[in-house]
């Protein structure tokens, strides 16, 4: 009986080892069972039977003791994803359903299955099982006893689930995915959108709202369904719930309990295997799919831009019109002021010329007297008097121009008021027409030029110049009168050029040029001639050099007298006839004349502009 139970015990131990190592990934040779010794292959009767029993018991204890050690060293250096995939593949393998009568299972099938499984897992050696005769009844009681000693499968499942959870929690990619998920949720929750409402023109034209409010306000768009991860669609049937629980509802097997316990792990594995989709911005996913939102935004932006351009063009046109009106009014006033000043300046210039002629005659008389007196003092006095006279003349001319300018302004204001009062009186134009018929040709020309059409154009011009119509009419009439006066006036004589004034600074007295120096041949030699007071009749000096070497001391009697030394005459340059002061004054006078001519030319151009542009504008 013992000889018959021995192979069943060995087979049960082998099955326990296979179940313990079924979840181990390939490539760990340390997890494989050690090769059986020769004691298992060749059983011997008698004492050999007892020895084989002890050996089998020792193997079972060693397998039990090695299970926690192998469990600790089993998953070291293995990728969490690969480990989870291997575990799920091991779980998804369909197991053979247990027969209703467990006692009818044939030991030959178990032996063949164990041989096949062991050969595939080890990949290095096979475990030959000794051929045994099929017993009439399977060793059920022994299996139950050994099964009671085997570890509880529920504890193994709990340990495996906790291990997978730890692997998933401590994987480096899970923390990153959690951060990305939190950032995406925060971005979606706090995102706001700006929309332009084209119907309301008030401050509610542009409103800001959260994404949910915008989605509610846009009725033509339907929310898109959340995209399913396509990476894991092929693996769903493999990792789905195991069919054992549905097929065998009444029976309970370790495989069924294992599938039920690892169902949440398979769902977690789906989340691990599928890459996390990138957080897409809601406006690109919703507004990019439809054209209504884009069209609304484009229309709103186009209207805002068009309104801005129109306002800018209106502002520029108003500024340009105001600038032109200011320029025209400034030109008119400048023309009026410069025209009166010019005419009065011409009259004052005639008086100034007369006064200048009197001053010139007086100056000529004074010069004649100074020439009679002679001397250099008269030149300085003449310069000082000329400078004083010029300064007085300039001051008088300035005062006269200022007085004439103020008088002209007062007369212009009084004339404008008189013309306004006459225009307000009825029948004013009829009286002017009668006076024009009785008057000469000048009045007729005046009426012909100032016709009603011209007055209408002038009134239109006044609106552009921001001035009253009466003021513009009076200004234009004054301009016309001055123009006629200038045409009828005789040509003004060209004034003679001014003489260059005498220099104002005092010149130094003229010194007569020195006499030319005598020739060297005519000069007497110092050794030959002596002054008459020191020269003796028989005294002759030896031709010895005066200073043969430095620090040489000679007697004083031997030294020649100082009168006999050579005299060197320094030739003084003759006084130059070039007087820079007179040339500078002449140049200054010429520049003043050119400036006056340019000023007159500018006034003429201004008058022509007013006559041909402003007065003839429709």
Curated annotation (Swiss-Prot):
Multiple peptides are derived from VGF, with activities in synaptic plasticity, antidepression, penile erection, autonomic activation, and increases in energy expenditure. The modification Pyrrolidone carboxylic acid is found at residue 310. The modification Phosphothreonine is found at residue 425. Residues 180-195 have a biased composition (Low complexity). Residues 1-23 form the signal peptide. One of its GO terms (molecular function) is growth factor activity. Disulfide bonds: none annotated. Residues 379-395, 435-451 have a biased composition (Acidic residues). Residues 301-332 form a coiled coil. It comes from the Eukaryota. The modification Phosphoserine is found at residue 421. Residues 23-46, 86-201, 219-262, 342-603 are annotated as: Disordered. Residues 356-378, 416-434, 578-602 have a biased composition (Basic and acidic residues). Residues 26-37, 490-500 have a biased composition (Pro residues). Transmembrane segments: none annotated. Keywords: Amidation, Cleavage on pair of basic residues, Coiled coil, Cytoplasmic vesicle, Growth factor, Phosphoprotein, Pyrrolidone carboxylic acid, Secreted, Signal. This is Neurosecretory protein VGF.
């Amino acid at each position: 009986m013992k000889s018959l139970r021995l192979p069943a015990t060995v087979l049960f131990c082998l099955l326990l080892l296979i179940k313990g190592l079924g979840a181990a990934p390939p490539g760990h040779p340390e997890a494989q069972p050690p090769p059986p010794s020769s004691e298992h292959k060749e059983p011997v009767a008698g004492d050999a039977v007892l020895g084989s029993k002890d050996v089998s018991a020792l193997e079972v204890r060693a397998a039990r003791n090695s299970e926690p050690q192998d469990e600790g060293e089993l998953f070291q250096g293995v990728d969490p994803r690969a480990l989870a995939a291997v575990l799920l593949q091991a779980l998804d393998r369909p197991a053979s359903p247990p027969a209703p009568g467990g006692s009818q299972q044939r030991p030959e099938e178990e032996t063949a299955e164990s041989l096949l499984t062991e050969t595939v897992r080890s990949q290095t050696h096979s475990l030959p099982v000794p051929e045994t005769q099929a017993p009439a009844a399977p060793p059920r009681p022994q299996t139950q006893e050994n099964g009671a000693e085997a570890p509880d499968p529920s504890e193994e499942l709990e340990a495996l689930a906790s291990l997978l959870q730890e692997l998933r929690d401590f994987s480096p990619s899970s923390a990153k995915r959690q951060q990305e998920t939190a950032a995406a949720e925060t971005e979606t929750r706090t995102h706001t959108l700006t929309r332009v409402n084209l119907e309301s023109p008030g401050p509610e034209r542009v409103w800001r709202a959260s994404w949910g409010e915008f989605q509610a306000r846009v009725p033509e768009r339907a929310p898109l369904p959340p995209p399913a991860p396509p990476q894991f669609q092929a693996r769903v049937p493999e990792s789905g719930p195991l069919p054992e629980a549905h097929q065998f509802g009444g029976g309970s097997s370790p495989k069924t309990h294992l599938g039920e316990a690892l169902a949440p792990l398979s769902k977690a594995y789906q989340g691990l295997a599928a890459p996390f989709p990138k957080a897409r911005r809601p406006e690109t996913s919703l507004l990019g799919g439809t054209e209504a939102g884009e069209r609304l935004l484009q229309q709103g932006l186009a209207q805002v831009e068009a309104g801005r351009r129109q306002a800018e063009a209106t502002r520029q046109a108003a500024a340009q019109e105001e600038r032109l009106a200011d320029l025209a009014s400034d030109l008119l006033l400048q023309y009026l002021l410069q025209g009166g000043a010019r005419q009065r300046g011409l009259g004052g210039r005639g008086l100034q010329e007369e006064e200048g002629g009197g001053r010139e005659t007086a100056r000529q008389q004074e010069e004649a007297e100074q020439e009679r007196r002679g001397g250099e003092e008269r030149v300085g006095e003449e310069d000082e008097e000329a400078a004083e006279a010029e300064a007085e003349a300039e001051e008088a001319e300035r005062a006269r121009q200022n007085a004439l300018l103020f008088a002209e302004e007062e007369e212009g204001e009084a004339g404008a008021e008189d013309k306004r009062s006459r225009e307000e009186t009825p029948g004013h134009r009829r009286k002017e027409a009668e006076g024009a018929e009785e008057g000469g040709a000048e009045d007729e020309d005046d009426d012909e030029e100032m016709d009603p059409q011209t007055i209408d154009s002038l009134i239109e011009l006044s609106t552009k110049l921001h001035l009253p119509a009466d003021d513009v009419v009076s200004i234009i009439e004054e301009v016309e009168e001055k123009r006629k006066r200038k045409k009828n006036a005789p040509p003004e004589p060209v004034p003679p050029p001014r003489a260059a004034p005498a220099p104002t600074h005092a010149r130094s007295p003229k010194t007569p040029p020195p006499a030319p120096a005598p020739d060297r041949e005519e000069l007497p030699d110092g050794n030959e001639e002596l002054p008459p007071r020191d020269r003796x009749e028989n005294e002759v000096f030896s031709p010895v050099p005066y200073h043969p070497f430095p620090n040489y001391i000679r007697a004083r009697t031997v030294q020649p007298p100082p009168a006999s030394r050579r005299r060197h005459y320094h030739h003084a340059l003759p006084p130059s006839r070039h007087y820079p002061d007179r040339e500078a004054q002449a140049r200054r006078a010429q520049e003043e004349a050119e400036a006056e001519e340019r000023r007159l030319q500018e006034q003429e151009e201004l008058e022509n502009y007013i006559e041909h542009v402003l007065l003839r504008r429709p």
